[in-house]
Amino acid sequence: MTSRPALGTHGSGAPSRNQVRRPSKPANALPPDCIDPTLEDERPAAHNGASEARPPPRGRPHIFYSTLASSAFDLPIHSFPYQPTVNLPVPPRPGSLHLRDASQQRQILPGGTGVKDAPKLGVPETVPIPVHFPGEKAADVFPWTGTNAEDTLSEALVKAGVSNKPQIMNETNTARPSLWSNLKNKSGITTLSTLFVAVLEKRQQNGRLQTPNTFKPPPRLTLRDSTREGWLHDLANPTVSLRRLSRTIPHGLTGKVLLDQCLNKNIPLPRALWLAKCVGINELRAHKRKGQAGTVTWGRGWTSSVEQFLDSVISTIGQGDWKLRITYALQLATHLYKEHLLDDDHFLGWIPFGLDMCSSERLFIWLLVVAVPHYWNDISSCRQRGKRLAESLLNHLAKLSPIEDLAAPSTALQFLENSLLKLVTTRPACLLLPISWPKHSAALKALVTKRNLPQTAQAVEKLDGRNTRLLSFVRNGKSSSRTGAARVFHKLDSINYAAPIRIEDLSYECMEITSNAVQLISTLLHWACSCYRAGSHRIYLATRLLRRWSHLGADVYEGIIVYLQSMSWVKSGEIHVLLRIVAELVRSKHFSVGRYLQWLIATGSLGCDASLSLPSSWPVRLITEVPLTGLSDQVRTLRSTLLRGTAHSTELEEQALVNVKQSISQAVPAIFGLSLTIPSRIELNFAKLSGTIRLEIGIWLRQQVAQHAEVNEQSYLEQCEDLAILADVIGITASSLDMAVLASVADTLLYHMKTFRAIGAFDPLLGRLAMRYAAIRTVKFPERELLLSFQNLARTAQPDGQLLQLLAYDLSRLDQKNAVAACSPASDNMGEVMQHAGTCSDDEIERILSSGTSMDQNMMSRVLRKLVRNLEEHVDKGYRQFENHPAWFWRLRNFDEATFDVVLREWLETSIMACQLHILQIAIPPLVASSCMELSSFLDILRSCLANAKATQVLEPATIAIDLLRLLLPSGLSAMSCSSQDAYRYRTEQYKLCFTSDTRIIHCIGEVADLVLSTPSNSMLQTVSSLLSSETVLSIVKEHVVSDPDCLSKMKTGQSGQASFNTCFKTLLNGLLDPSGQWCLADISPEEQIIAVFKAASELSLPLCQAMIEHIFASSSALDTHAVDRLSVTVLNAVRTSMEKDQSQGLELLTNLEGPLADKIRSHAEREVLDASYFLLRGSTDGIASDCIVTAKMMQKYLTVIELTMGETPQADEQFAMLAALTDRFKGIFHALSECGGLGTPTNQATASPVVQVLAALLSLVASHGPQLLRNATQSHQAALMVALQDIVTHASLELFPSIIEHVFDVLIVLSDHISEDVRNQIARLESAKSTNSDRAYFIHSQKAPIDGWLMLTKPVIPPLEPPQPPNPNTTQNQSSPYQSPQMTSNTAAPQHRYFNQQQQQSQTLQPSQQTQHMRTYPQYAQHAAQPNRHLPAQLQRTPSHHASLSPLQQMQHMQQLQGLAQQRASQPSPIHSQRPTSVASPGGMGGLAGGNAAPSKAHTSYVNQQRDTQQYPFVQPRWEILAESSGNPTLNETAISLSLFGARRV
């Protein structure tokens, strides 16, 4: 006995309900027609979740190739709305191939297993509710009563089941046996053709209607409010028929009121549309009396009502059942739009406008409106609306993207992103926004990256390329095609020295730009030694980068030797900077001196010129500039041996080194422990010493300072220019507790901050100094000098806020400590003191400053003058004790800082205007050193005084302006009115003002030069020239040109333009651009200067070369116009030469050209482009290919010049001439494409055709000038250009060049944004006449064929018997183009107006048509009714539609007779070819189909000729009159169409 397995065991019984149920929709699937996509499915839980898969059977793992379904998702998914609960398993067939899975099935063993699985409790499954349909009855479900036929089992029911088979009669036979024998012979095709013609004729006769139009609009009645409400409630009730409601349509339901009533009463959509149509047709008939304008006005008003209705419903978001209301309103508006009951242009234009103006709270609803398929397709398929849609989406994305980073992503943002990605994928042309693309491209790329969509990312990249191609050149912008060297230069110039330099990141960034190590090292050395850059920081930054690259595996030695051998540094490089970089690398063992000496011996480079100052003698000079410390004895000996035969003597070098050491020992004996020795002032000229001596001196001084760290002396290391050793010395001395030494350390750090940042030592030294300052505070109170120096350093370096707070606290304590506890103000005790104005001793000043705690403005002014007078006496008498004066100024300021600033400003202005130069030179250094005045404040005061002097024509301040300017410029001379420490601090402030601040110092230099040169003195010219050509001014200008290329033009801002200033400014430019004088810019003509400037142009000298070009043109423009023309031609020739030599730097010179110069160069280049393409106008195509090859390359060069000089809009006459010329060129290209045939084959598509290259060049010119040209052009010029381009884009020869087609299409799109509506209509009519209505043309011009364009009414014209009458104006008006839409004529309601004209025409032809109603047939096929067919028997002749139809048996007999006749006609020509009349066929019609082949009689021929004279005109289907139900008479024609007009048409 076999035991039955228990229920619930594996492998037995029916599968569970969860296994057979189809899986639920994914979580992210949106329910259809739902307002809120985030709403969860409201179905029961049994339908929502997908059950987990059944665990695999025990004893064997579930293998991946098993054929059994492992989960519910593996079962087939059915599309039925309802599935049965349980599916019985199918038993396996014998010999099944699935035996390998049998082990997974539970086997029933004889005798039973003896073990049963424990029953498991589970959640009872809920029986799903069956699907219900209208009628409140379940589908195909009968409650069991036992009496149903399906409940009674029988043998037939068990075998065949239950099915509802239709009861049909058995067919007697099929037509195949009788037809096949006739069709397989030679006459089969002829027979089949005859049969098809007969079927078509019969089909058309049976489908033709005869009754005329009997449509009448339902009338409207004036009802009371209660009656109207009841009628509306009946309309909302589906059980009340429309036929009864149409008798009493209430009056007053129009516009927004009608829509609101439909919404409030929840009227079903079909009935709401019925009501809108009934009201609309009555309103149209009422407004017809006012003419066409009345119907147009009503149509626009109705559309505005729908828009206001939607807007009002959207504004109720969040109130009550707003979701249902918005859903209904949107569906109603969508149905009205689908029925074409709205002004499409106005409505589709309103939707993007609403999206653009909506707030973030309503963005989701407006996105939902836009996402309606009908709206989305029609908006995105038009350029005007699609562009507005794209801009709106991008603007909202720019607003919401920053918010997303701060909060969780919202549903509206996701919907927005999905809509934008859909637009990118389906309609990328809508995103052709060349003007705003740079603003939105980054956000769009970030979106694609976030979504991780590779295909969409490719579409965005392609879109970016298309927009970039359409972009006109942006003035003062960086070129996108910069070389790798230029990008490395930019990276090095843009380093922020105010923050620590991450040398690792900088080195990797440079390596990413240029991967070739030798090329990267050459680029770095070229930047470091360039004469167009200033500052010693370049040496140490380059050294650190080279060390880093050497650590990464680069051969630094090889790269340096290759660069030195190239001699590319000779023209613009400084050899001493290169040698100094090599010396630093020798110190760090990154450059092998021994290897270099071997290279010298192997190459024989020692036999060079005798003078080491020549560039060619660099191999020998290099070993005279390396440090000897650290070199082995063998290398030193070899170096001395190699230098014996040169101009450099090692013996003299050693003697000079000993002399310098002795002189320094005598000057600063304290460093060497000789504190008792009196120091002697010995002037040493370090500039004449070799690099080796200076480096050795630096190392020697560091060793001495390490032994005596209390010494304060840094000038010798600065003169040796060994700032790396100076950093080491500062690190040693920073451990001192001497406040004067620490103050000196702080000043030195501040002065060399940029260099120490490059070295990498600034932040460690600053931290060590801060720790030492904190240690001093715990022992004793810091002195004023240390606090002031450290405060200046902290303000510039910006360390942590705690250090600044400590310094501010200590300075406030110092003020309180120095204040004297006195009750009376200082003015009460100064009467006696100030009576003796002549006495100004130090004791009296000390007593004045200590006599009180407050001081008024007058008294402070007196004391300030007294302090200045005392300082002047000390200077005049030769006293060297100036330590007290900075402290006195500082104590005076502590009385009242605001009052002191006012007093000091008044005194400075008075002194400047009184030309008291000596007093200012004495007083300003201690005032700045004591932090009583910022040097930038004196700069502002000086500029203000000079401006007032120039305005009032007071020339006295001009005599001292240059000397006052020198107070602002750093120099090697120490201030004579302060101590050395204060002088160093003052020089630090000068350096900060000139090199690390803004460009105010550049403005001041230009203003001083202009004021001085405005004086009648001729001696000032040489003074200003020497000032502008000084090394200090040149260094300042170089520093600021890097960060602000326009600073040179700022120097000339506001100048009067006198010749003397231009001469001095030319001297400055010569010193900047040609410091060595090798170009001789001062001695050559302007044309030669331009050529020299183009030769000297590089990435580093670009701003200077641009300033030189501008200055040359500015100077020549003052002479005559011909000189400017000659210079323009010279520039063009220089640009052409640069292009031929592939020098992009020459083209970059044109970037910043402004004004008439750029216009002249651009106009010249434009003329050259047009002249180069003149061969396209000659008409003949002989030799056009060779001309195009030469022309295309030349045009590309000139196009580059045009883009670089793109500026203001050209004049009107130039615009018209260029527009006409471009139109002629495009017509010539179209002619060339047509005459040349094919331009290539698919095998050589990569090689562009010469004609296509010329086309691409002209397209670039149009893209840069087109918008400006079309704005002011006439309509005829606009239309001509657009038509010429549209002819090219549709030319068949360009199919092999899809990129060119895309380029032309993009240019057409951009140009279409700037043409008028009249031009659009004109172009649309031209395209309609060509019958080339395509989606591309509609997208560009926003003009589409009318919806009813396929409807063409054909009316025969029968010659009248009476004299001809003048034509009906209505009929003539209707004879327009078949694709002339209402939009083309700016007529919104034209369909309604045209319909009323049709009604008038129908009324004129109604009576004749009724008279011939029963004898009418198709005019084209009159031969079928006029004469019988000679080959067909009479019973097979085609009968008119009013004859009674034949029985099926008679039809079968007719078909058999037709087959016999077809066999007899097998030898005759086919009637399809010989008997088809040439009649006018309307679109969609078929013309003549068949007829007799005999010669027609004279009567028949005349009748056919008479029927050929027909007229066609469009038919506009009256959408308003297509009602669902009007009357109960089914025989009436209520389609609002006069069917008599279709007599000459086949369906």
Swiss-Prot record:
Molecular function (GO) terms listed?
Answer: transcription coactivator activity
Tell me where it mainly resides.
Answer: nucleus
Q: Does the keyword NAD apply?
A: no
Region Disordered: which residues?
Answer: 1-63, 1356-1509
One GO term of the biological process aspect: positive regulation of transcription by RNA polymerase II
Q: Which GO terms describe its cellular component?
A: mediator complex
What superkingdom does the record give? Answer: Eukaryota
This protein's record includes keyword Transcription regulation = yes
Enumerate the Pfam families for this protein: ARM_SRB8, Med12
UniProt lists compositionally biased (Pro residues) regions at 1357-1369
Listed Low complexity bias regions: 1398-1413, 1446-1468
List compositional bias (Polar residues) regions by residue number: 1379-1390, 1469-1480, 1499-1509
Keyword annotations for this protein, in alphabetical order, are:
Activator, Nucleus, Repressor, Transcription, Transcription regulation
List the subcellular locations: Nucleus
Q: What does this protein do?
A: Component of the SRB8-11 complex. The SRB8-11 complex is a regulatory module of the Mediator complex which is itself involved in regulation of basal and activated RNA polymerase II-dependent transcription. The SRB8-11 complex may be involved in the transcriptional repression of a subset of genes regulated by Mediator. It may inhibit the association of the Mediator complex with RNA polymerase II to form the holoenzyme complex.
Q: Which family does it belong to?
A: Belongs to the Mediator complex subunit 12 family.
Instruction: Report quaternary structure and partners.
Output: Component of the SRB8-11 complex, which itself associates with the Mediator complex.
Q: Which PANTHER family match?
A: MEDIATOR OF RNA POLYMERASE II TRANSCRIPTION SUBUNIT 12
Q: What name appears for this protein in its UniProt entry?
A: Mediator of RNA polymerase II transcription subunit 12
* Natural source organism: Phaeosphaeria nodorum (strain SN15 / ATCC MYA-4574 / FGSC 10173)
Q: Which gene encodes it?
A: SRB8
